[in-house]
Design a protein with these regions (language model features):
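Primarily recognizes the serine-hydrolase "nucleophile elbow" in alpha/beta-hydrolase
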Residues: 1-34
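C-terminal catalytic histidine-bearing segment of alpha/beta-hydrolase fold enzymes
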Residues: 64-115
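Alpha/beta-hydrolase-fold catalytic nucleophile elbow
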Residues: 18-21, 41, 71-74
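Short, proline-enriched alpha-helix->beta-strand connector loops that line the catalytic pocket
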Residues: 15, 33-38, 64-67
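Acidic catalytic loop of the alpha/beta-hydrolase fold
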Residues: 45-49, 78
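Short alpha-helix in the alpha/beta-hydrolase fold that links the catalytic acid
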Residues: 50-60, 69
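Short, charged, surface-exposed secondary-structure boundary motifs
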Residues: 27-30, 49-53
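Short beta-strand/loop motif that positions the catalytic acidic residue
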Residues: 34, 40-42, 46, 73
Length: 115
């Protein structure tokens, strides 16, 4: 969540932000426009950010007129980039394929926005 919070605290100073398995909670400034491009990389089966929270996040990004993208990885829980994550009961499981894909997407996104 810290990455997404940053777009409200430093929005004028960053070109883009990438969130890996963020919590997608409502922002502290719901009516503020977002000038940074946003890429949220999300595990669709993440119990810490269920589909309704994802939908609310997408609506909020649209209302803020953000240049946003969300990629939801199927069969993927929270902490999918952390090789130490192995607690399906808690909802954190490493997913190597989503880890590799998300890294490629993040580097491509950053290359675009930092151009």
């Amino acid at each position: 969540q810290a990455t997404l919070d940053m777009i409200f605290e430093l929005w004028a100073d960053v070109a883009g932000v990438v969130s890996f398995h963020g919590l997608l909670r409502p922002t502290p400034h719901p009516n503020a426009p977002i000038r940074a491009a946003v890429l949220a990389l999300h595990g669709y089966d993440d119990p810490m950010a269920p589909p309704e929270q994802l939908h609310a996040f997408q609506q909020e990004m649209t209302a803020a007129q953000a240049d946003w993208q969300v990629v939801a990885f199927g069969g993927t829980m929270h902490a999918f980039t952390n090789p130490e994550a192995n607690d399906p009961d808690f909802g954190t499981v490493y997913q190597p394929r989503a880890d590799r894909r998300s890294w490629r997407m993040a580097t491509g996104f950053l290359a675009e926005v930092l151009g």
